[in-house]
Amino acid sequence: EEMKVISIKEPYASFLANGMKKIETRSWKTNYRGELFIHASKTVAKKYMTNDTVKKLAKTIDMQNGNIICKCLLVDCVYMDEEFIKRIKKNKKEYYLREYKIGRYAWILENIKPISKIPAKGHLNIWNFDGNDKIKKDKNN
């Protein structure tokens, strides 16, 4: 059975898997809702090295680069306006663990559960994984 997957750079993918954050931010919106698996990209986000909060938290986790590491439910995709950003700033940890800017989108995730890691090659956008690394681009974006 095919799984819907999104690749996220480390340490952010592991922050999700470890329950440290529940929102993923993107420059694009998705209409997809439902079960979503999180793939930790092979590359590490260089930006995180410039943020002390993120650097400190990154030391507390084992990065899982190149693996699908958790599953969740994508329940909403919210356009970031001034009001939304004002609200998110109150949750300092969540705010520091991604890029919150007017015009971006917040993907709201629930029921985040770590899984036994599955080696996989990452891709852009939401992609399908059938266990054999035969990737087909998702048309539901």
Language-model-detected regions and their locations in the chain:
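Structured alpha/beta reader/binder surfaces that contact nucleic acids or chromatin modification marks
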Residues: 1-141
